[in-house]
Amino acid sequence: MEPSFAPYAAHSSQTRGRVHREAPAAPRSEFQRDRDRIIHSTAFRRLEYKTQVFVNHEGDLFRTRLTHSIEVAQIGRTIARLLNLNEDLVEAVALAHDLGHTPFGHAGQDALNACMREHGGFEHNLQSLRVVDLLEERYAEFDGLNLTFEAREGILKHCALSNAEKLGEVGRRFIDKKQPSLEAQVANLADEIAYNNHDVDDGLRSGLITLEQLSEVTIFGRHLAEVRRKHPTLQGRRVVTETVRRIINALILDLVDTTRTNVVNSGVETLDDVRNAPPLAAFSPAILEQHRELKRFLLHHLYRHYKVARMSTKAGRIISDLYAAFTGDARLLPPEHQARESLEGTRAVADYIAGMTDRYAMREHRRIYAVEEIYD
């Protein structure tokens, strides 16, 4: 039995269903079932060894795609509860949103997209959908995880029109310029809250950015000053974690207040109303600008730091080399991927590379290109 949600929330009892029909899984709701399938998937476990910003072996305490996804789910559930939305759907979308991400973060994605430019490109959101629709191999009756329509549309955050046209119903909203459920919108913004603030935390831990630099950023400086005023003797990591905690809380509360106002002003009463309205989940204009200022700071001072740039260059080289090797000679692929390559060509190669963890990609690169490992 589902809790009582807002009338415009997504109710699993009213789901638009799964591609392959299945009997109900009582006592779980359909969205709980989605979440459980995602958690038990191979792709979800691989996220433990996929980069957020820093390559996994650079340090044990830096975030990975797995810890990031868990943090997004936690933030998303908090927002959903405050807005009386379906927490299970928000959690499912949050946990699955990065399943299609390449090794080495955005550097890996950019490199693979460049390799696939003449073959449809590579979008990690589209790849996440491909993972849950096709690539996971767990069930006797179907490929993929056979998730509900609502979970699948939430995973597909962005999609080029050329690709949307090939996806049928789940890609239709990009063509019709409609919105996904509020739960999907919340999961998207929870992702932004999580990665900005946790990249701040990891950036400070790495020493690539400093508190002094961040104090010039409006939203961080304001909360840092509050922490120092309230806890004048606080030192070290506790200053950072207390500041980041306060920023996350402030962003959540602003998002909830602004979204509530948007819902009231728009007059939405049903999920269909949500789909036909402008985006409803949002930050206030003032907080949105402060959030963007923080993103700009991270872009210039962390993501473009020369040490991160060096890691990104190496990562791009590994991905490009692997793609060249596998498309140049399919015999270098493992047997099961050779079979898929003979049917799907370069897309099967992209699937194989995108599914690698950071360390597996580095190992495969050494096996193919390092002459000292000729017998590996």
Curated annotation (Swiss-Prot):
At the top level of its lineage, which domain of life is listed?
Bacteria
- List, in alphabetical order, the Gene Ontology terms for molecular function in this entry: dGTPase activity
Q: SUPFAM superfamilies, per this entry?
A: HD-domain/PDEase-like (SSF109604)
* Matching Pfam families: HD, HD_assoc
The keyword Hydrolase appears for this protein? yes
HAMAP family per record: dGTPase_type2
Q: What region holds the HD domain? A: 65-196
Q: Which family does it belong to?
A: Belongs to the dGTPase family. Type 2 subfamily.
**What keywords are assigned to this protein?**
Hydrolase
Species this protein is from = Thiobacillus denitrificans (strain ATCC 25259 / T1)
Instruction: From the UniProt entry, list the residue stretches annotated as the region Disordered.
Output: 1-32
- GO biological process, alphabetically ordered: dGTP catabolic process
Q: What is this protein called?
A: Deoxyguanosinetriphosphate triphosphohydrolase-like protein
Family matches, as SMART domains: HDc
